[in-house]
Amino acid sequence: MKLLEQIFEIAKKEPDLIVLAEREQKFTYRQLFAAVSHISEQINERNLNQRPILIFGKNDFITLAAMLATNLRGHAYIPVDAHTPFERTEMIKSAAKPAAVLTTVELSADFEALFTDRISLELTDQILTDKLPALDFSKAVSGNDSNYIIYTSGTTGVPKGVEVSHDNLVTFTNWMNNDFMKIENNQILSQALYSFDLSIFSLYPSLTTGGTLISLSRDETTNFKLLFERLNKTVINTWISTPSFVDICLLDPSFTEKEHPQLVQFILCGEELTKKTAEKLLTAFPSANIYNTYGPTEATGAISSVKITKELLTENDRVPIGFAKPGVDLKIMDKEIIIVGDSVAKGYFENPEKTEQAFFTVDGKPAYHTGDAGSISADGMLRYQGRIDFQVKFNGFRIELQDIEANIQNLKEIEKAVVLPKTNDQHKVTALIAYLETEKTFEDRAAERAFTKELKAELSKTIMDYMMPTKFVYLKKFPLNQNGKVDRKALAQKERGDN
């Protein structure tokens, strides 16, 4: 059965069940499919080709409905968050060449010009009062059809689209449902941007089991006061987020089992879980089931998991990333973690060169080069040992350092750029340091800070805010190693000044 049909079966049985709760409004499964039906009709009226559809919006009800409606009409969806910089959105649109663009937010003039032939969606009273519609699932995505395409950081400065099939998503959803979604009337945190693959941890397992998505707005995730207020008046049973987001919430003294007795499960992914964070969370929620999971976007969500216990933390210097889920074979080749099996995505959308570099086959099965160093113990436990290339996780987001470098080097007065991660004793990336080769001279620190401010303003037009370097270091010439290459280790020792 197709995922959409599974969700629709729940809507037929319990149409008034809450599917998603925003800060000010709650929506039912009936209303979800009324909106899906309405949007799918608008898509159908366009007589589109079968290329993907770009959806520009926020983490909200209407954007979720647009994603499902797109799949209902047989299209993959490309989620792009409304706060994505214009130039980056333009690059994604240019690379994807979507059949159409759906927008669920008000647009500024430049975005209106970019999305000239868009389908503008809004939530109307008619949609919310409609009865549960009869839907035709014959054209809905299935099998190896592409379900969604998420654009991630690319080494050349141009984002690349990870193409995930319906079968990939079914495999992931079934695993999540079998292992984690056994809580009755499950209320599941939906914090990750829809354009970030961590979002599928919440979306599809919740929708296919009759759960309720507790959706946090950007205002709430970026304003601690609003965030803590919302959490303290909201019942959540299953928590899904990056470890960094947990770190933020642990700053609130009331984020404890005593104040949140219904919060019984944590599923963490998106970046390395440090021992300090794991220990703090175990102390705050001693009775909860806490899981560390691992998996790149190219392997559909996560492919391994392990329950966090005091014993596990005592026995390991770094928190292990777990045992492989069914259908996944993990291998270590030249110290690199290789993922083999039915979770591996189709490749990078219409980018055969990048696909060939990262995707291959092992014994006839799809495989992916993660770029992560790791080891597997005799009992099958996978351990993460850092990146083997220039890709890092910072605040839960996967970032290609060369993406930032390429965009900086496009700026005036900058000859070369190297971006390096700064880590703490827990191996967690705490900052991104940009080293810039430039002939620019500064009369004083004030002049340097002013130049940095201008540089950041220009850079913010082409990279996401979470990719912005924390500090900028200016050099006349980069040090070189014996091979004539930039000596990154020497650069790391040259960090100076505050910006």
UniProtKB/Swiss-Prot annotation:
Binding site for ATP: T152, S153, N292, T293, Y294, G295, P296, T297, D372, Y384, Q385, G386, R387, K485
GO biological process: lipoteichoic acid biosynthetic process
EC annotation from Swiss-Prot or TrEMBL: 6.2.1.54
Compartments where located: Cytoplasm
GO CC, one annotated term: cytoplasm
Residues that hold D-alanine according to the record: D197, K485
Superkingdom to which the source organism belongs: Bacteria
Function: Catalyzes the first step in the D-alanylation of lipoteichoic acid (LTA), the activation of D-alanine and its transfer onto the D-alanyl carrier protein (Dcp) DltC. In an ATP-dependent two-step reaction, forms a high energy D-alanyl-AMP intermediate, followed by transfer of the D-alanyl residue as a thiol ester to the phosphopantheinyl prosthetic group of the Dcp. D-alanylation of LTA plays an important role in modulating the properties of the cell wall in Gram-positive bacteria, influencing the net charge of the cell wall.
HAMAP family noted in UniProt: DltA
NCBIfam families: D-ala-DACP-lig (TIGR01734), PRK04813.1 (NF003417)
Protein name as it appears in the record: D-alanine--D-alanyl carrier protein ligase
Gene: dltA
